[in-house]
Amino acid sequence: MSKNLKLKSARAAKDMSQKDLAEAAGVTRQTINAIESGDYNPSIQLCVAICRILGKTLNDLFWEDEEA
């Protein structure tokens, strides 16, 4: 699994720490860190919650860009 730089960038754009995002999503900071590091595959429910908090879509944050 690759690092999720899109999530990290979106979180930083909202001036949120991993702890801030974790608290808003109801998970631990370690969970957010693991998602951003590519070490954890979150549930669809958690993905949707993170998207709502950051004002992004699933496509924006979690789907891989297809190479043409």
Language model feature labels by segment:
Residues 13, 52, 62-68:
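Short, charged recognition helix plus adjacent turn
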Residues 45-60:
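DNA major-groove recognition helix of helix-turn-helix/homeodomain DNA-binding modules
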Residues 27-40:
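Recognition helix of helix-turn-helix/homeodomain-like DNA-binding domains
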Residues 5-24:
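Short basic helix-loop element that most often maps to the first helix and adjoining turn
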Residues 1, 12-13, 40-41:
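Short amphipathic helical patch at the helix-1/turn junction of helix-turn-helix
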